[in-house]
């Protein structure tokens, strides 16, 4: 026992000694970290290990370079410091010097054997880091020592020029141009997959969608409602029949609702593709950075002003999307194509219209650097196509709006109508806008002006008064107040949902029918019966119809006006005070059915 006790004490002593020696080994790095040149010199004179690492792998040379201490760096190199060593994160002394843009230390490190083309984590190079910093002298040293001007990182395939352009370092970009860097280089394609495609499935709704697309291919337009009715299996149930909660077993025979669902559920859906696509160029990076001077350098050097990214983002689209209107103006003056759209069909005119009436909720909104209406006038003066139609929903549309307003096929005029932007609507009309162009789901400008797609607290509206006048304008232009979208909704459904009482009165006075039902709302979950129920405009006003994830909001005054107008029209209005929890709605009521 005695011997074992002594051995235990000896082992403990060895362990403590090892800890003490390990701690002592960091003294050189610690002194450099403290910027204590005298202590460091004393340690080196005693033969301390110049390459001893701290816990994170940092050596004295890392700290000297990081602190920008040229004399300490030279001292450590003279004592044998490894200029190529990396810490645990992969940072080398040259990485740190390049990030700092320290030309003098970069030169010393290269003289001591560092590699100007060393590959750092994620494939980055010292020249990329110096370019991001915009340090011209540091860049020159690296380039003079053979740094690859067109090296690409392994994460996004970006080059030094892209790093400089992204930070708006015009002088750094000019230097790279002068040294022969590739102006037309592109970053790698986006690694993320595209969104869900609307393809074949076992859902009968997909079959309906294919039938609709066949008509589009043959006739160049969507089928009218009579064609969709004829496509049904005539089981008599329609949207009020026995709906199955499982869409794959949907045999309700209501192909109108199925067509709407195939094109996006309750009338809306999110974007169908990722909107970056990768393949950005230095010019697109410069536009995204709102660096007019960098854009100027690249254009003067011969960059194509209409080059596009993988998704089709041109410099003008990027500038417009980000509200950099002065840059957009400059690009237009240099000859940018005002009608060049990306894969979503988004044009500068549509994006500027959307920006003027931006939704709240999902995106922080920067102020424009130029009056938005003046910018739109500039686009129009350059020949913007006022009737260009969207292919995909815009990037700023919130999930709430996407769930019941599908922007495919929309024009800038329809988008302006959604926000009751009377001034812009009139401007677009003056330039040839066709007010009767609908979305692919047959949603009209009148419907969105009345409230289809309205989300409380999200949708932008110029004013209630202006919206009323916008609705009046659309009626005067001949838009049909009883036109139904492929969801079955009419303008009155939107006005009821929004609680736009004066709009309701105006629409009814111009012939809007109050007994028109939609074709069922897939967003009323609760029960299959409720999901299949069809709704009157007054039901929307009573807050019985939920659209997407937004809550249904009751508008008692609008409901009261609906009932008065229905009585005047000889219609039997539903009882007041209805709620889904307390009453049984006639069409879905049965003896043994009790709403949840």
Language model segments and positions:
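Disordered, low-complexity segments in secreted/periplasmic proteins that are enriched in proline
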Residues: 192-274, 581-596
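Bacterial N-terminal signal peptides
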Residues: 9-20
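Ankyrin repeat domain, specifically the short helix-to-loop turn at the C-terminus of the second helix
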Residues: 44-49, 74-82, 107-115, 140-148, ...
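Ankyrin repeat A-helix N-terminal signature
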Residues: 30-34, 63-69, 96-102, 129-135, ...
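Ankyrin repeat start-site detector
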Residues: 56, 88-89, 121-122, 155-156, ...
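Ankyrin repeat boundary signal
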Residues: 52-53, 83-86, 116-119, 149-153, ...
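Conserved ankyrin/ankyrin-like repeat signature
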Residues: 39, 71-72, 104-105, 137-138, ...
